[in-house]
């Protein structure tokens, strides 16, 4: 139960960091919706559903493993169920900045590209991008769909594991503003070499599960992330594989601050039902959600689409479609998978 006094002209969203695995949500007896997948965020607008006094929130969660699910019934990690990441109320203006992207252009260390997307009735607005340390200030105007893109010449200090440089980035519309810490780097391959900022890098790393350091349960906080990553740092790592599912946002951001390259993965694990269309749609949705949340995290260099999946033609089609989807959403980062020997 909770009470909330919403300011006139504002909108309110109920955000879940993650719920494992199937979540059905009601507010004040009204069915808000259903979410499948235990490792990505989702939200509902509740602006017009609030009571003046006490509000009642009910979440029904089922973490039962199913053969057609992603992951499937056989996976070698603890299947912690329930609400595993923070639940928050987010108040927004009537027209707000729904999403944005700010990174280096592909293979160009001197060009920052990006876009912003507004949501609401007043979609045509002036947008200001401000990166004070780089003396970058760019104004663009969104179109009738609330979208605007930009391309800016600049020479930022490039993010590396040795110098994980991040810049304060501010985006402001006429009705909303957001701030972020963003790093800039290029990533590509040349034969069998991985090139970070056009220099070959050797990735020294380990796999980490999203489990609390000192007791049983899902890790979810900045402190959890810092402890786990500090142990990786003690081992001499510059790279972590966040296995085998999208980890919480605190983990990804702390890894970025601490100088860890990241392999980020969806739980297409072992014996997925390759022929099942719903299974594919589930996997693709988790991939899209992972990329949408973390597209501005420069330390992520690999979107991983699978782990140790037995060879078959149906698997090849399934994974090829996922790889193509990832490339359609992100033409810069590498696409990978951990494969069984074939």
Protein language model features and the residues they cover:
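A short, mixed-charge helix-start or loop-turn motif at secondary-structure junctions
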Residues: 210-214, 269-273, 305-308
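Alpha-helix N-cap and loop-to-helix initiation/capping positions
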Residues: 220, 278-282, 314-318
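Secreted/periplasmic carbohydrate-active enzymes, especially glycoside hydrolases
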Residues: 1-254, 258-262, 286, 301-302, ...
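Acidic-and-aromatic substrate-binding clefts and catalytic sites of carbohydrate-active enzymes
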Residues: 240-248, 272-274, 280-281, 310-313
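Substrate-binding/active-site clefts of carbohydrate-active enzymes
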Residues: 207-208, 266-278, 326
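Substrate-binding cleft/loops of secretory-pathway carbohydrate-active enzymes
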Residues: 340-342
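Active-site groove signature of glycoside hydrolases
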Residues: 289-314
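Ligand-binding grooves and catalytic loops that recognize ribose/phosphate and carbohydrate rings
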Residues: 275-293
